[in-house]
Amino acid sequence: MSTAGKVIKCKAAVLWEVKKPFSIEEVEVAPPKAHEVRIKMVAVGICRSDDHVVSGTLVTPLPAILGHEAAGIVEGVGEGVTTVKPGDKVIPLFTPQCGKCRVCKNPESNYCFKNDLSNPRGTMQDGTRRFTCGGKPIHHFLGISTFSQYTVVDENAVAKIDAASPLEKVCLIGCGFSTGYGPAVKVAKVTPGSTCAVFGLGGVGLSAVMGCKAAGAARIIAVDINKDKFAKAKELGATECINPQDYKKPIQEVLKEMTDGGVDFSFEVIGRLDTIMASLLCCHEACGTSVIVGVPPDSQNLSINPVLLLTGRTWKGAIFGGFKSKESVPKLVSDFMAKKFSLDALITNVLPFEKINEGFDLLRSGKSIRTILMF
């Protein structure tokens, strides 16, 4: 029986309040309106940013259905949708690409005005919601809410991908892989023969290591306080791995001594103010580039001495790896299918969707790189 144009009842993981587990609930998912797409989820990754919402360090309206790294199949489309059709394999995009705003028209930027990151409303782009639970409206997250068997997204927030692609792997291109790989190959534009430092060896940090290697870096120094992550980092391209706890000096001083005054490129993939500063300070004062990738807590600010930049350092930030999402995601999936990079090493656990809380426990314990939930 066709579900097109009808309300669908399905399972979703609802976060009712911060610092509480997810609750598996039956929710109602409304049909897509004009220029919207309803997707049946197949695979979804657990990302640290989702956990930042649970802990309260990343603020978004609650109750909500979180999740933003996923892949699925189009179930239905609203009036006027032209870029996807029912049956297409797709990846939802937490950074949309409307193609019309000033940012989308700028070839060097990707932070589309239609995003729900800067000032989270927890709604679709028209300001309304498509989820209810027991008659109560439930907020969206980053416009895509992938911790649900079905979700509704705007057409500018979904990309059609290769019909042969394995959704349980390419779902990582929806956030973790792209968010780490892009800062190296697209934002910093790492050069062949250069020296790089990557702070944080979770799924995104390891993807940054992969990006540095793909760009031809000669030295890739991986930094983490969890030595259990070093073997995987070396497998993916790190030439050296260091633990800040092994040194009496600040880690930036250690790195400067190792690299004749500082690295060419550094990447902070944790989201802590102290490591953001260490990442900046470890890059060469005259020619280094440092990129902020990790999401810092909403309420914290940094103060810096302007001389740190005056001497010639470049300090950048990257959302979704600097990639224009709707046009870049299909290309990244094609590159994966062409074996230009592998995602297997990033996936350490696969669980049924109902075990979402167990998946978050694995993340918090440092025992997983990426856990994939299967519907």
Curated annotation (Swiss-Prot):
Protein family (similarity comment): Belongs to the zinc-containing alcohol dehydrogenase family.
Binding site for Zn(2+) 2: 98, 101, 104, 112
Gene3D superfamilies per record: Medium-chain alcohol dehydrogenases, catalytic domain, NAD(P)-binding Rossmann-like Domain
Keywords: Acetylation, Cytoplasm, Metal-binding, NAD, Oxidoreductase, Phosphoprotein, Zinc
Known function: Alcohol dehydrogenase. Exhibits high activity for ethanol oxidation and plays a major role in ethanol catabolism.
One GO MF term attached to the UniProt entry: ethanol dehydrogenase (NAD+) activity
Protein's cellular compartments: Cytoplasm
The protein's Enzyme Commission number: 1.1.1.1
Main location: cytoplasm
Reaction(s) catalysed by this chain's protein: a primary alcohol + NAD(+) = an aldehyde + NADH + H(+); ethanol + NAD(+) = acetaldehyde + NADH + H(+)
The keyword Transcription regulation is annotated on this UniProt entry: no
Other known facts: There are 7 different ADH's isozymes in human: three belongs to class-I: ADH1A, ADH1B, and ADH1C, one to class-II: ADH4, one to class-III: ADH5, one to class-IV: ADH7 and one to class-V: ADH6.
Expression sites (tissue/organ): Expressed in kidney.
Name recorded for this polypeptide: Alcohol dehydrogenase 1C
SMART domains: PKS_ER (SM00829)
GO biological process: retinoic acid metabolic process; retinol metabolic process
Enzyme kind, highest EC tier: oxidoreductase
